[in-house]
């Protein structure tokens, strides 16, 4: 194949010598949207779901420190967001997934509070106990045009 760069710009930044990651964990507790087939998807997280997410985040925090022998640490802010997600994206390749555009207006106020190195968005897309299941073919992460989501928001907030 052939590849090339166009409109390439090299900028100088400041080196951050900190080994601590500032992470935002956004727990999106509710979805209320129409699916491609016209059906309504309405899911609300239960307290046990939120507790499970918080427990996993604590394990992530301790695992980063342990696995790097203290060379990387994590501090995070957790935001429980009750405003429902009104759209979710669908593609034949991936099924349903949360695209940054689906939640951007909801999460931007939280992300503008401080600078984050990484963003976790926790969403429940199904509930087997209630027989709610939608096709999700792969975990694809929150990216847009090959850029990590937090970089997009830093750019938009800075403008």
Descriptions of predicted regions:
Residues 15-139, 143:
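Propeptide-to-catalytic entry region of secreted or membrane-anchored zinc metalloproteases
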Residues 146-159:
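Short pre-active-site segment immediately N-terminal to the catalytic Zn-binding motif
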Residues 4-6, 21, 146-148:
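Residues that flank catalytic or metal-binding motifs in active/ligand-binding sites
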């Amino acid at each position: 194949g052939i590849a090339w760069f166009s409109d390439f710009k090299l900028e100088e930044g400041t080196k951050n010598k900190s080994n601590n990651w500032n992470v935002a964990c956004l727990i999106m507790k509710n979805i209320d949207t129409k699916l491609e087939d016209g059906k309504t998807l309405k899911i609300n997280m239960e307290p046990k779901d939120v507790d499970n997410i918080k427990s996993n985040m604590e394990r992530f925090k301790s695992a980063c420190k342990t696995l790097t022998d203290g060379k990387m640490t994590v501090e995070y802010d957790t935001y429980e967001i009750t405003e429902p997600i009104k759209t979710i994206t669908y593609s034949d390749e991936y099924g349903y997934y949360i695209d940054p555009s689906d939640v951007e207006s909801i999460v931007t106020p939280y992300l503008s509070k401080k600078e984050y190195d990484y963003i976790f968005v926790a969403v429940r897309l199904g509930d087997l106990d209630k027989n709610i299941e939608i096709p999700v073919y792969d975990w694809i992460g929150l990216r847009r045009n090959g850029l990590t989501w937090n970089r997009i928001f830093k750019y938009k907030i800075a403008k």
